[in-house]
Amino acid sequence: MGKVLTMAMPKGRIFEEAAGLLRQAGYRLPEEFEESRKLIIDVPEENLRFILAKPMDVTTYVEHGVADAGIAGKDVMLEEERDVYEVLDLKISKCHLAVAGLPGADWNGVAPRIATKYPNVASSYFREQGEQVEIIKLNGSIELAPLIGLADRIVDIVSTGRTLKENGLVESEHICDITSRFIVNPVSYRMKDDVIDEMAARLARVVEGETAQ
């Protein structure tokens, strides 16, 4: 039996895309893999163990070594700044981080309020712009903040822009593009470099347009 590779995977839409990518790379995952409600899924025939986590927690699991590798959004990596290796851009779950607000709304006072679940990214961005702002951290329904007067603007993930439009908000600034990345724990990479390199190579072939034989 070979070395078992433990992977942290984000629950939700990214998980389904990532599972599809692994299948394309030739990994035999159970048919019910995506529908499973288990938080730990063992795939012994591939020497793989999957830990299903909230997207914002994947980098934490990998940094602390409870997972050897993982798939995480670049947004989470920028926000959390964990000590992990970014091995490969998987080019899935494409979206971008943006500033948005009500159309025609002026900045409020000296330090406008910015609502976001990415306080570190938002602070860094506005600091680079030379703007002093007050950051308000929220965990969800970020679009609500300008509508109820909690914030002047928001910093959030934009995919299709539909949620902004439905709430009467407009995007005013594009911060950066986001995709999901294959990340690795530095110590695990030294111990399991062969299996990790093989997975990275197989995934890279799929990303570059080839399919596993």
Curated annotation (Swiss-Prot):
Domain statement: Lacks the C-terminal regulatory region which is replaced by HisZ.
Entries under InterPro entries matching the protein: ATP_PRibTrfase_cat, ATP_PRibTrfase_CS, ATP_PRibTrfase_HisG, ATP_PRibTrfase_HisG_short
GO CC aspect terms: cytoplasm
GO biological process: L-histidine biosynthetic process
Function field: Catalyzes the condensation of ATP and 5-phosphoribose 1-diphosphate to form N'-(5'-phosphoribosyl)-ATP (PR-ATP). Has a crucial role in the pathway because the rate of histidine biosynthesis seems to be controlled primarily by regulation of HisG enzymatic activity.
Chemical reaction(s) catalysed: 1-(5-phospho-beta-D-ribosyl)-ATP + diphosphate = 5-phospho-alpha-D-ribose 1-diphosphate + ATP
Originating organism: Bacillus velezensis (strain DSM 23117 / BGSC 10A6 / LMG 26770 / FZB42) (Bacillus amyloliquefaciens subsp. plantarum)
Quaternary structure, from the entry: Heteromultimer composed of HisG and HisZ subunits.
SUPFAM superfamilies membership: Periplasmic binding protein-like II
Enzyme superclass (EC): transferase
GO molecular function: ATP binding; ATP phosphoribosyltransferase activity
PANTHER family: ATP PHOSPHORIBOSYLTRANSFERASE, ATP PHOSPHORIBOSYLTRANSFERASE ATP-PRTASE
Alphabetically ordered keywords of this record: Amino-acid biosynthesis, ATP-binding, Cytoplasm, Glycosyltransferase, Histidine biosynthesis, Nucleotide-binding, Transferase
Catalytic activity, EC: 2.4.2.17
Cross-referenced Gene3D superfamilies: Periplasmic binding protein-like II (3.40.190.10)
Biological pathway: Amino-acid biosynthesis; L-histidine biosynthesis; L-histidine from 5-phospho-alpha-D-ribose 1-diphosphate: step 1/9
PROSITE patterns linked: ATP_P_PHORIBOSYLTR (PS01316)
Protein's cellular compartments: Cytoplasm
Name listed for the protein in its UniProt record: ATP phosphoribosyltransferase
One matching Pfam family: HisG
Family statement drawn from the similarity comment of this UniProt entry: Belongs to the ATP phosphoribosyltransferase family. Short subfamily.
